[in-house]
C-alpha cells in the first residue's frame, strides 16, 4: 500500500508537529492531536501499520474568567461568573439567524452561530490565540463540523448545571496506547 511515495521531512525524525517526545519519562505531544476519523480505509491502514489505537471519550476543560468549565464553551458556561453566563445566554437567545449575508469570515460566523456573549467571551479571543490571526481573516468553509451549535435547551442546561454530554466530532476519539500521537508517524516510518 502506497509504497511508491516519497515523504519529505524537515527534521531527521518523522511526524513534523504530529510527533511526541520523551522528557524525563513523560511523553509530550508536539501539539493537540486526536484522531476522530470514521474513514474505514484510514482506520484499516492504521491497524495494518500497528499504530495500536485506543478508543477514548473526551474529558476536556477550559479555564476562562477565573473558572473551569467543560469543553465546548458554547454549551458549558456553568461555573463561570454570573455576568458572563448571563451575557452568553442572552446573546444566544437573541440570535435570530436572519443575517445570513454577513457570514463572510470566521468572526461574523461566530456572532451568527452563537451570539455576542459566546463570541466575545470565548470564541473570538480563543481563535486569535489558537490560529494566531484575526478571526476576520479566517474562512468559514471548515467550521460547521468543528464547532457544534448546541440547541437552546443544551445551552440553558449547560449554564445551570454541569453537563457531561460530548458535543462535536471529537467527543470520542482514537489515540495511541503508547508513546503519544507520534506513535502513528513512527509506525508509518517502520511499516
Where do the model's predicted regions map?
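Short, flexible helix/strand-to-coil boundary loops that buttress conserved ligand/catalytic motifs
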Residues: 18-22, 39, 123
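Dinucleotide-binding Rossmann-like beta1-alpha1 core, especially the glycine-rich loop
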Residues: 24-98
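Short, solvent-exposed loop/turn segments at secondary-structure junctions
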Residues: 12-14, 69, 128-129
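Short glycine/proline-enriched coil/turn segments at helix->beta-strand junctions
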Residues: 1-5, 49-51, 190-191
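Active-site/ligand-binding neighborhood in enzyme catalytic cores
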Residues: 84-191
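Glycine-rich FAD pyrophosphate-binding loop
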Residues: 1-22
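Gly/Ser/Thr-rich beta-alpha loop segments that engage phosphate groups in nucleotides
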Residues: 17-18, 33, 68, 182
Amino acid at each position: 500500500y502506497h509504497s511508491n511515495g516519497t515523504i519529505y521531512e524537515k527534521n531527521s525524525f518523522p511526524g513534523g508537529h504530529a510527533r511526541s517526545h520523551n522528557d524525563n519519562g513523560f511523553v509530550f505531544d508536539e501539539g493537540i492531536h486526536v484522531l476522530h476519523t470514521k474513514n474505514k480505509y484510514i482506520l484499516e491502514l492504521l491497524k495494518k501499520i500497528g499504530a495500536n489505537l485506543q478508543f477514548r471519550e473526551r474529558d476536556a476543560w477550559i479555564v476562562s474568567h477565573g473558572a473551569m468549565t467543560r469543553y465546548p464553551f458554547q454549551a458549558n458556561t456553568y461555573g463561570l461568573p454570573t455576568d458572563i453566563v448571563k451575557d452568553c445566554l442572552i446573546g444566544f437567545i437573541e440570535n435570530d439567524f436572519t443575517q445570513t449575508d454577513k457570514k463572510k469570515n470566521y468572526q461574523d460566523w461566530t456572532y451568527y452561530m452563537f451570539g455576542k456573549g459566546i463570541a466575545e467571551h470565548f470564541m473570538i479571543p480563543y481563535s486569535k490565540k489558537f490560529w494566531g490571526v484575526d478571526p476576520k481573516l479566517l474562512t468559514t468553509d471548515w467550521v460547521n463540523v468543528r464547532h457544534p451549535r448546541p440547541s437552546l435547551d443544551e445551552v440553558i442546561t449547560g449554564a445551570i448545571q454541569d453537563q457531561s454530554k460530548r458535543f462535536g466530532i471529537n467527543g470520542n476519539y482514537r489515540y495511541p496506547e503508547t508513546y503519544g500521537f507520534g506513535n502513528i508517524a513512527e509506525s508509518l516510518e517502520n511499516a
